[in-house]
């Protein structure tokens, strides 16, 4: 780790791989050896080495040297800009899943989960937990080698709470975090891995919530309402934020993840127990029967691709998988989740899997018949599932837009046929405590905090005021509960 070495003297930047909140990542080649590396350029400026070395990511990665944890090769500070030089991996787990045209064999999923657990066990043993486990933060060289990456949110287990409550991507966020706990610990990594494990089987997120409250509702709709005796702390957290658990019967997980073995189901469900204290830790998880199989598990001996090797893309990986499955099917000794006829080799379809389909009987609850996932209508380049998902409108009835200062609401009086257009002007900042709590509990901001301006009434009649009993500050919206009126009583 040095500030005297110039980046341009040692590395040749080739292309941009991605951009995040804290920095951008570039693909580069080491000039003297030809090795490919990933260089993360931090957006924040660092004016001393002491400041740079105090970063959580540096502190954790300096202590964590493991085959299933991404290796930090060096740190370079140049012109007050900090560069992290990491070993290069071909892709992340999300990219590996979205390029699939068929389900993974369970043996492949088992090996991926085994390697992630090995990395987590080492991390937790050395006093750190990740806090942001998700498919994008698990780097891959095909399905053979996986490594945990992005330790920007990592925490020391022995550090004292309270912690910041906004951690981890929502779809993989543990319920204690959704309920605003500030004393969580390493079990949140186990919950996230349980969600990732389910996603590897069904190739779409298990709990794709659109907000924090919707995330909780989606978890409850599948796992059922937690028992108060089973998790009393959860009910205390819910009460503190004015949230009430809906009484819902659990959906049989066999209907949701229907290609998993009994041993895999046991591990996955235990990692997603409501009570964090009852979830197995990483070491305990590695001793489950799911991993007691007659096959080699773990990282291969060679973890870094040869300097001059050509990157094997996900599409190429799918083609290789198809060829191998066809050959094995011809010998009648292949056991897996794919069913390929030796007379008609499986055709690899360049398609994009919609991993964000709703969880219903037409998508997940159907029984798997081991068929490929099917083609799309076009081979044109398509946006990723996450881009499609995030681009959709997140309109919630009654919500005041964060991007506009004025909203118009049209209401119709059913008795007179008159139409009233009301313009509300609301500030982005300075929400009342009532509005804030309401947003936490229900996922939208009630309109009673907005200032009403310029009401206009069309088609007025003489008997309009007699038939319309609404006050000027109330709105008629058929089919909706007037939460505002209830709240201000």
UniProtKB/Swiss-Prot annotation:
| Single biological process term from Gene Ontology | intraciliary transport
CDD domains, per this entry? STKc_MAK_like
Record InterPro entries? Kinase-like_dom_sf (IPR011009), MAP_kinase (IPR050117), Prot_kinase_dom (IPR000719), Protein_kinase_ATP_BS (IPR017441), Ser/Thr_kinase_AS (IPR008271)
**Principal localisation:** other
Residue intervals of the Protein kinase domain? 11-291
Name listed for the protein in its UniProt record: Serine/threonine-protein kinase dyf-5
Q: Name one GO molecular function term.
A: protein serine kinase activity
Upper lineage: Eukaryota, Metazoa, Ecdysozoa, Nematoda, Chromadorea
Task: Read off the PANTHER family from this record.
Answer: MITOGEN-ACTIVATED PROTEIN KINASE
EC code = 2.7.11.1
Deletion phenotype, per the entry, is: Sensory neuron cilia are longer, not correctly aligned in the amphid channel, more dispersed, misdirected and sometimes turned back towards the transition zone. Abnormal localization of kap-1 along the full cilia length. Abnormal accumulation in the middle of cilia and in the distal segment and reduced speed along the cilium axoneme of components of the IFT machinery kap-1, osm-3, xbx-1, che-11 and osm-5. In a kap-1 mutant background, 30 percent of mutants have branched cilia. In a kap-1 and osm-3 double mutant background, loss of cilia formation.
Identify which cofactors the protein needs according to its UniProt entry.
Answer: Mg(2+)
């Amino acid at each position: 780790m040095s500030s005297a070495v110039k980046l341009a003297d040692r590395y040749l930047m080739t292309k941009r791989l991605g951009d995040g909140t804290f920095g951008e990542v570039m693909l580069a080649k080491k000039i003297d050896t030809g090795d490919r590396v990933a260089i993360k350029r931090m957006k924040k400026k660092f004016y001393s080495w002491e400041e740079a070395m105090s970063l959580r990511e540096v502190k954790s990665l300096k202590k964590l040297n493991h085959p299933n944890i991404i290796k930090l090769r060096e740190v370079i500070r140049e012109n007050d800009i900090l560069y992290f030089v990491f070993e290069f991996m071909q892709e992340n787990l999300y990219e590996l899943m979205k390029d699939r045209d068929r389900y993974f064999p369970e043996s492949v999923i088992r090996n991926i989960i085994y390697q992630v657990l090995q990395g987590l066990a080492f991390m937790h043993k050395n006093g750190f937990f990740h806090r942001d486990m998700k498919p994008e933060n698990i780097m891959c060289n095909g399905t053979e080698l996986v490594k945990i990456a992005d330790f920007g949110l990592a925490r020391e287990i022995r550090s004292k709470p309270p912690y910041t409550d906004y951690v981890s991507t929502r779809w993989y966020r543990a319920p204690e975090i959704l309920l605003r706990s500030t004393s969580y610990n390493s079990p949140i990594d186990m919950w996230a891995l349980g969600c990732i494990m389910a996603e590897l089987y069904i190739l779409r997120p298990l709990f794709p919530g659109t907000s924090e409250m919707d995330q909780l509702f989606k978890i409850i709709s599948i796992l059922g309402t937690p028992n108060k005796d089973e998790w009393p702390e959860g009910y205390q957290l819910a009460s503190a934020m004015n949230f009430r658990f809906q009484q819902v019967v659990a959906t049989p997980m066999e209907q949701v993840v229907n290609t998993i073995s009994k041993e895999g189901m046991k591990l996955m469900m235990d990692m997603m127990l409501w009570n964090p204290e009852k979830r197995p830790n990483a070491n305990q998880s590695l001793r489950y029967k799911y991993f007691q199989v007659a096959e080699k598990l773990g990282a291969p001996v060679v973890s870094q691709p040869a300097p001059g090797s050509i990157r094997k893309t996900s599409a190429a990986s799918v083609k290789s998988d198809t060829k191998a499955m066809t050959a094995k099917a011809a010998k009648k000794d292949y056991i897996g989740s794919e069913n390929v006829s030796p007379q008609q080799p499986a055709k690899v379809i360049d398609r994009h899997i919609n991993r964000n389909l709703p969880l219903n009987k037409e998508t997940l609850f159907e029984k798997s018949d081991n068929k490929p996932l099917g083609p799309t209508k076009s081979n044109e380049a398509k946006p990723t599932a996450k881009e499609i998902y995030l681009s959709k409108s997140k309109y919630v009835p009654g919500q005041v837009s964060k991007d506009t200062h004025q909203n118009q609401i049209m209401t119709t009086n059913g008795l007179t046929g008159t139409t009233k257009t009301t313009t509300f002007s609301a500030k982005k900042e300075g929400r009342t405590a009532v509005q804030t709590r309401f947003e936490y509990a229900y996922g939208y901001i009630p309109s009673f905090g907005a200032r009403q301006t310029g009401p206009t009434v069309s088609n007025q009649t003489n008997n309009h005021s007699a038939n319309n009993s609404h006050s000027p500050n109330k709105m008629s919206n058929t089919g909706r509960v007037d939460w505002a009126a209830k709240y201000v009583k």
